[in-house]
Amino acid sequence: AQIAAFAPVKEQTAWTAEIGTRGKMGWASWDIALYRANIKREMLQFTVGRDIPATTFNADRTRHQGVEAAFSAAPTDWLRFRQIWQYSDFRFVADAQYGNNRLPVVPKHVLRSELRLGNDDLHIAPNVEWVPQGAWADYRNTTRTTGYTLLGLSAGARVMAGVDLFIDARNLTGEKAIGDVSAAILASTASAIYHPVERRAIYGGVRARF
């Protein structure tokens, strides 16, 4: 059996700045935040092998910066649009080994949108999750996962006061894609570090409130 060698690590420290806005104007509302964190000795993990626990090491300097933005619009009682956008720029900073490479696992852009038609008595809501470009799989930035688009649909109906029926259909088109990654130092498409998105699935049930 393989045994991973112990690598001593030091505590990480960081300076973080964040600015944002939250508000409502008429039938539209928003919540936007911009952030930046400069980190020293960030503790990063990478996969050694399938049967070996992930190993942790200290990076020299890294930077996490990005935008988290949510927007909602409800022009009528029966129509509501919601959208969430995440922009993530996580990278090494002038690292001796990795230069300014991006950190793996987290994709650069993620967009989630939902359009709800109806009210609490009866509604249907198509939704989409779009990752235009997948995340890097390794710290050397040699292998990147592909982007994907997941389509879903949810619906609900009120049977009586406090009792609702619901249905949640996910990945309607049966999209096959990589949804998560266990980071590696150097990866290939054959590396055992990839985890798929949820397969096509339909859930339904009853919610009761007392």
PLM regions: where:
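Extracellular loop and loop/strand-boundary signature of outer-membrane beta-barrel proteins
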Residues: I3-P8, T16, I52-N58, G66, ...
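Gram-negative outer-membrane beta-barrel transporters
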Residues: R36-N38, F57-Y139, T173
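Residues on the lipid-exposed face of transmembrane beta-strands in outer-membrane beta-barrel proteins
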Residues: I19-G23, A69-A73, Q83, S113-L117, ...
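Repeated loop/turn-to-beta-strand initiation elements of outer-membrane beta-barrel proteins
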Residues: W27-W30, D77-F81, D121-A125, A161-I167, ...
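C-terminal beta-signal and adjacent terminal beta-strands/loops
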Residues: K40, W130-A137, A157-F210
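Membrane-embedded beta-barrel scaffold of Gram-negative outer-membrane proteins
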Residues: P8-Q65
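Outer-membrane beta-barrel translocator domains and adjoining extracellular loop/strand segments
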Residues: A1-A4, E42-R50, S88, F92-N100, ...
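Residues that define the transmembrane beta-barrel architecture of outer-membrane proteins
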Residues: T13-A17, K24-G26, R61-Q65, V105-L111, ...
